[in-house]
Every structure is written in C-alpha cells, then in structure tokens.
C-alpha cells in the first residue's frame, strides 16, 4: 500500500507543482486552469475508478516483472484525486510572493529559470509543502478504497477480503487493519511535516 501511494503521490507532485507555478505566475493560465480544478477536484475516487480501469485495461501491456494492472489502476486513481491540494497551494504560494521581490527580479533581469529557482520556489515552498501534506493524506485515504475495488494487494484488499469472508474473526482483523491505516496515515503526515520544517523557514506555521 505504501509503495502504491508513493508512486501515485510522486506522479501527482510532478504534475501539480509545475502547473501550480504556471498558474500562479500567469493570470491567463490561472483563468484557464482554475475552472478545471474546481470541476474535477470534487470528483469521488469511486467515479474515477471505472474510467481509470477502462483506460489502463485498454493500454496495459505489462508482462513478467512489470507493474501489475491493479497496481497501475490504484496508483493512477491516487494521482487523479491527490494532485489538487498541491496544485491549489502551489498556485496560491506563487501568487502571494512579495511584489517587491518580483520587482527586484525584473530590475536584475533574471532569466525565467533563475526567477523560478531563486525566487518563486523558495518563497512558495511553505505553501507547497502544505499542499503536499494534504495531497499525501488524500492519496492514502483514496488508496484504501481503490485497493478494495481494483483488488490490488494491500490493506484495502485485506479489509475487503475479510468483509467478504465474514468469519467470527473478521471484525477483529478489520479493526486492526483500520487502526493500522490510521497510524500509517499519521506517520506519513509526520514525515512530510519533518521535511517541511527542514526545507522551509516557516515549517511551524
């Protein structure tokens, strides 16, 4: 489960951060991207899952040693549901940069790449990390439901199998799994918080 959620989370981060930077820097891009975010952000993972399943099934060409289809379905579903908090917070962080700093970058005639790496990212990093923490939490929650329905090996599939089993011990096993899910979710958030504190000047906000 942890492997799957990190795979989906990394893809979501790779998509959301660049889009958020573009959206934060350009009002025109924001006007185009923001409506799409508001349309797709509320969509339930249960709605995404059939679409993802059909697309992955049509394109899947895995073999021995490759990623399983159920793994890809779960990971892509995590990506689609978890990228929005990071995208929104990145755009907000970039758009909130001190205007004086922006003016200084213009006076110094910084190239777009230097402007992003030396001004935009350092200034927006606290909000970016806030988005990453939210995204990882959403991804972990979504993953459990995705594993149940896609039958990808993990905690979600374990809970579903025990529910289907219906033996006298199933309830106890499900409760242990639920506690495990909660504890892992808490630990994942603590890891992201530690990284936020390490790499930003306002990690305690």
What feature does the model see in each segment?
Residues 175-205:
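C-terminal transmembrane helix and the adjacent membrane-cytosol boundary/short C-terminal tail
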Residues 38-85, 92-93:
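Generic hydrophobic transmembrane alpha-helix motif, especially the helices
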Residues 76, 80, 112-146, 176, ...:
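Transmembrane alpha-helices
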Residues 131-186:
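Non-cytoplasmic
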Residues 1-2, 25, 29-40, 101, ...:
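Hydrophobic alpha-helical segments of integral membrane proteins
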């Amino acid at each position: 489960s942890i492997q799957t959620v990190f795979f989906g989370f990394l893809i979501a981060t790779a998509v959301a951060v660049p889009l958020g930077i573009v959206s934060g820097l350009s009002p025109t891009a924001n006007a185009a991207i923001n409506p799409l975010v508001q349309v797709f952000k509320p969509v339930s993972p249960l709605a995404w899952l059939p679409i993802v399943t059909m697309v992955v099934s049509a394109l899947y060409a895995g073999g021995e040693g490759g990623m399983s289809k159920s793994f890809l379905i779960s990971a892509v579903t995590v990506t689609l549901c978890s990228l929005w908090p990071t995208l929104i917070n990145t755009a907000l962080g970039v758009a909130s940069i001190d205007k004086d700093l922006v003016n200084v970058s213009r006076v110094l005639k910084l190239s777009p790449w230097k402007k992003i790496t030396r001004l935009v990212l350092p200034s927006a990093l606290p909000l970016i990390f806030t988005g990453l923490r939210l995204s990882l939490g959403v991804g972990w929650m979504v993953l459990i439901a995705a594993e149940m329905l896609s039958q990808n090996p993990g905690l979600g599939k374990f809970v579903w199998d025990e529910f289907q089993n219906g033996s006298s011990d199933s309830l106890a096993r499900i409760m242990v799994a639920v506690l495990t899910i909660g504890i892992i979710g808490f630990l994942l958030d603590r890891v992201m918080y530690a990284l936020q504190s390490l790499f930003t000047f306002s990690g305690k906000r």
